[in-house]
Amino acid sequence: MEDEQINFANKNYKISEKDVREYVLARFQDVKCSKKIKNLVTFQAANKYMIMAHDQVELKNLGNIVASYKKIPFSDILQEYQGHLKIAMVKEPTMKTHTNVIMHIFGYFSKHLSQGEKQLFFEWLEQFRENRIATGNVLSKISPIIYRFNNTYLASQTYFLLYSDVQPRILFNVLNKKNTLGEINLE
């Protein structure tokens, strides 16, 4: 899946899993430079579903590392977090892990949907599982629901930024910044 390209609404723009990893790791580098626990907490929250798509076990480990900030020096937390983040991001997301993430997201608003809307959601999910639509297509269908219920937590998830078909122009402005950063080396 390394070379798999995720298609966006504009077919001229494509993003690879390598681009996803580089983006997340570059944002972590920003956290390291800030040397602030609040930025690490924000990073962890914003990347929860992205990391979950890659490695749910490491997501839990990362959460525990962040939670230990009162017991361990921040520099040690950053070093341990970085190691586990790299492990998580190396693992390729699968249909199963994306489905798990999408179901977790669905849980945020499912009780507010009508039966017809729920049925439509599960039809999208089935199309995704049958490989008839891409991850981005499912997320771009979910995105308006998130805004309808004003769920800022979900709207701020990098999972939507990097996989959704909704706003590829913004994504590529962000990813173009990686070219100015050069190779990202977190060792």
Stretches with model-predicted labels:
Residues E2-E187:
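Acidic, Ser/Pro/Thr-rich low-complexity regulatory regions
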